[in-house]
Amino acid sequence: KYGNLIPSLAEDWSVSKDGLTYTYKLRKGVKWYTSDGEEYAEVKAKDFVTGLKHAADGKSDGLSLIQDSIKGLAEYVSGESNDFSTVGVKAVDDYTVEYTLNKPESFWNSKVTTATMLPVNEEFLNSKGSDYGAPTPSGILYNGPYFLKSLTSKSVIEYEKNPNYWDKDNVHIDKVKLSFWDGQDTGKLAENFKDGSFTMARLFPTSASYPELEKEFKDNIVYTPQDSTTYLVGTNIDRQSYKYTSKTTDEQKTSTKKALLNKDFRQALAFGFDRKAYASQVNGANGATKLLRNLFVPPTFVQADGKNFGEMVKDKLVTYGDEWS
């Protein structure tokens, strides 16, 4: 609920006083399994070292998130160093992994949850060679709650519960089937939900069939976190190029520049744009406001005295002059 990290493969962790060293104590008895459910090995601290080295050697796309964080990793990735032992990851013992950072990062634990930081069993990696990680059941070694059972491109992906998963009692879905949708027939998704083929399907609030679906399934419709985003749209107050504009004369260019430098003009643009109407083109009238943001975080991220940050700002702005009221 509050975004707190809950250990899984690790039981606990500690941070050095200078914030540079993170030490993780691994859960004992967690096993690797093949796609057939056969026990392969125990998950050990060295698997995390192997995993990071594999990502670095393979120039993983996710490296940019961590390579400037972990001591020596950027140098290894760039080729400045070819000695991975200089990289700030170490298996202290079978159940203790230690990471050394270049500088303190209070958000470091959130990076540990990314795919680049996952463990890799060295023996399995070497046995598979270039086929390691292939999107087939046998190309993957498993320590999580599900096995990949099948993957057909542009068709379906199927998973089955790992009966030996260490936390299996908290895994309540036995089979997962993900069906491919090509983005064409939006009505087909709702039909598959209605006939029981899907247990979850996306609805499109701007489709012709949505009003009827909303009445029929009003208690089943939920809005997922809205992440369709346009970042940092601003006014160019130092315009130099007029290549892609109808403003061609010096007088027109001068007038344009004066307008852009005028605060009232810029505010008029901001206040005149009907963001709700714009957002409703995708989310419909009822869901439009769920897309709107004035901040990089949800409006409820900071609250005090029963009011969220946006409400507090609105109350304060009226005291700052007529231009904000």
Regions found by a protein language model. Name each.
Residues 27-60, 145-282, 301-325:
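Extracytoplasmic/periplasmic ligand-capture domains
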